């Protein structure tokens, strides 16, 4: 497999940038990816928007599943993302992003 092992755990994570915007991404190593973002070597969107606050992350059994959740989260308006995180917590936020996909076993970690 070109991008890692089939049983590798991937994470969806949500950052708050210094300018108040949110960034959602996927990685198989949270610490490494945050370091990349802080050094300006992460996603283009986050360059020049440091420092960041990690609002949370959730594990998934593979890259494809993590990317599907990331896509759904990115399609939500910022105010909806923040309202979900503030009122019902991260588990429900991720479950809401999944909509029709099963949410069992997903834990959102602040």
UniProtKB/Swiss-Prot annotation:
InterPro entries: GIY-YIG_endonuc, GIY-YIG_endonuc_sf, UPF0213_domain
Coiled coil: none
Pfam families documented for this protein: GIY-YIG
Gene3D superfamilies for this protein: GIY-YIG endonuclease (3.40.1440.10)
Ranges for domain GIY-YIG: 8-83
Disulfide bridges in this chain: none
Family affiliation: Belongs to the UPF0213 family.
Protein name in the entry: UPF0213 protein DVU_3309
Originating organism: Nitratidesulfovibrio vulgaris (strain ATCC 29579 / DSM 644 / CCUG 34227 / NCIMB 8303 / VKM B-1760 / Hildenborough)
Lineage of producing organism: Bacteria, Pseudomonadati, Thermodesulfobacteriota, Desulfovibrionia, Desulfovibrionales
């Amino acid at each position: 497999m070109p991008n890692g092992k089939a049983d590798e755990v991937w994470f969806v994570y949500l950052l708050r940038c210094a300018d108040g915007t949110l960034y959602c991404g996927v990685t198989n190593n949270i610490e490494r990816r945050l370091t990349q973002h802080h050094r300006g070597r992460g996603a283009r969107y986050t360059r020049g928007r440091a420092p960041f606050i990690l609002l949370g992350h959730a594990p998934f059994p593979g890259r494809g599943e993590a990317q599907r959740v990331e896509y759904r989260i990115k399609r939500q308006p910022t105010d909806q993302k923040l309202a979900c995180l503030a009122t019902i917590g991260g588990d429900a936020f991720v479950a809401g992003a999944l909509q029709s996909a099963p949410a069992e076993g997903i834990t959102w970690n602040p």
